[in-house]
Design a protein with these regions (language model features):
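Hydrophobic-ligand binding "helix-grip"
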Residues: 31, 55-102, 108-110, 140
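Hydrophobic ligand-binding cavity/cleft-lining segments
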Residues: 1-43, 146
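A conserved amphipathic terminal alpha-helix motif
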Residues: 108-146
């Protein structure tokens, strides 16, 4: 067993507040996070915050994520249950970048040596997809209505 980590960086033209609010709204994940998240919501709590547990996924595979840090609009951390790894913790850090936001999404987990490399690649690819999708979904629409 060993500890392994990854880091994903994405940029958004949305403000840190807009990105944070999107990520903090568990029921909305199903609207923007892609095909792996068909269902999303809170198990405990109603608006998030430290101690709240969100359930994300698609039948029959779900994860439960317990919010461990909630510092709007700059930082959110959570621990994850329901995956074949131990001690999985993620942190999303948001920083102003010009007129937008830099999203730094990192994860750490413990896994057997033989599984660590493929699990790290899978988790990194999944989180990269979430970061890219969140960056786009948080951006206000520029389409004008007629």
């Amino acid at each position: 067993m060993g500890e392994h980590s990854y880091l994903v960086v994405a940029t958004s033209s949305a403000t840190p507040e807009q990105v944070f609010d999107l990520l903090a709204d568990a029921p909305r994940w199903r609207d923007w996070a892609g095909s792996s998240i068909r269902e999303s919501g809170w198990i405990t709590g109603t608006t998030g915050g430290v101690g709240a547990v969100r359930k994300l996924g698609r039948a029959p595979l779900y994860t439960e994520e317990t919010i461990t840090e909630f510092e709007r609009p700059h930082r959110m951390s959570y621990s994850v249950a329901g995956l074949p790894v131990r001690d999985y913790r993620c942190t999303v850090e948001l920083a102003p970048l010009g007129n937008g936001t830099e999203i730094r999404w990192s994860g750490r987990f413990t896994a057997p040596r033989l599984l660590a490399r493929p699990l790290r690649a899978l988790l990194r690819r999944t989180v990269s997809g979430f970061a890219t999708a969140a960056a786009a979904a948080a951006t206000p629409s520029t389409r004008q209505r007629t």
